[in-house]
Amino acid sequence: MKSSKLRAGAVLACTLALTACGGGDDGQLAIGGSFSGVTKTGLVLTNNGGSDYAVVPTTSGVGNWFFPNLVETDSKYNVEVKSKPDNVETCQVIAPTGRAVFATNRVDVACTFKKHDLGGSVANLKGELVLVNGADKVTIPAGATSFAMAKVPQDGVYGIAILTQPAGQTCTIANASGTMGAAAINNVAVTCTP
């Protein structure tokens, strides 16, 4: 008798726990996940061609999202990208399809920023010059008239600095810092004297 009461209590506890997690018979299950690479508005996700959701961007570009419309228990979901921010090249949905048995928070969306060239001109360089932009380091040989750094994500900041001056010369940089727009930056100017 005592063990049957314990079993009944355990079943009740499990049922209540499942209902609280979205696993009950009411079918009110949330579909969502995480996102990365979203710093601007424009990412819209859709489930089965409807139930659109505009992801709210974050400064860091990462966060979580959930469709506001809940789905029925055992229904199929198919998450797709309807539109993407203008500073993004592509957005990939990871684990986009499934069947809603419990609330789902594992439909992740990974967006890749557009990247653009960063470079410019060099004047009167007689020795070797080393430039840096964050972790990117470029060695420019004597006599060079131009240079290129690693591509920078759109809307990302850049700041080119001189790490090593050429022997016997002093070089300065014009237009060394800014924010990458929708096109390449090629007006950075390095001038060396004498």
Where are these regions (language model features)?
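A short, amphipathic beta-strand motif
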Residues: 29-37, 118-123, 160
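Short Pro-Gly-centered beta-turn/loop motif in secreted/extracellular proteins
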Residues: 64-80, 146-161, 166
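C-terminal motif of bacterial Sec signal peptides marking the signal peptidase cleavage site
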Residues: 17-20
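Short, acidic Ser/Thr/Gly-rich low-complexity loop/linker segments typical of extracellular
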Residues: 50-64, 136-145
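Bacterial N-terminal signal peptides that target proteins for export
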Residues: 1-10
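Short, ordered, surface-exposed loop/turn motifs in non-cytosolic proteins
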Residues: 38-51, 124-137
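Bacterial signal peptide processing site
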Residues: 22-26
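Structured interaction patches on ligand/partner-binding surfaces of diverse proteins
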Residues: 58, 82-114, 165-194
